[in-house]
Amino acid sequence: MIQQKHDLYPNLCTQFIDNSHPELYEIIKLSIGNPTNAKIHAVLENYKTLNHHLIGCLLDNRLIGIIGIQLIGLDVNIKHISVQPEYRYKSVARHLVYAVIRNFKVVSIAAETDDESIGFYNKLGFKCQLTENVYGRRYQCILDV
């Protein structure tokens, strides 16, 4: 992957992550509602399929953030994004979104989110629309690249 310097962490490494990475289970469960072992394993199995990718941020060889995406033609759907609690609000998630933009030829990025994360997507320039589904109040967010 192409590396881009991070302001706070100059030794931050962004790379593709295999779904068997030893730290992946603990970090991806942060982005899964009501995570159970079965649910987490099912999510990780999806990343074995074609057009699904995991990109991680490693700091001193420790996985501190992850973004899971699905490529659909020239579009990307963010399926999961999570950052270890001690590294939140330090631009790690933004760094992950930019890694997707730098490394895939895409025209748009979509994500579904909640009230807790809507500000993150707005700051990155996503256009977000309120929707309701079985999970309650959600937002459909789109970024034209």
Segment roles from a protein language model:
Residues 1-42:
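Short amphipathic alpha-helix that is part of the acyltransferase structural core
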Residues 29-60, 66:
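Active-site rim helix/loop that mediates acceptor-substrate recognition in acyltransferases
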Residues 52, 136-142:
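Short hydrophobic/aromatic beta-strand or adjacent loop that forms the aromatic wall/cage
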Residues 56, 62-70, 75-82:
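Conserved beta-strand in the GNAT
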Residues 68, 95, 99, 110, ...:
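Hydrophobic, well-ordered beta-alpha structural blocks that scaffold small-molecule cofactor pockets
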Residues 102-116:
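Conserved GNAT acetyl-CoA-binding A-motif
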Residues 115-138:
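Conserved active-site alpha-helix within GNAT-family acetyltransferase domains
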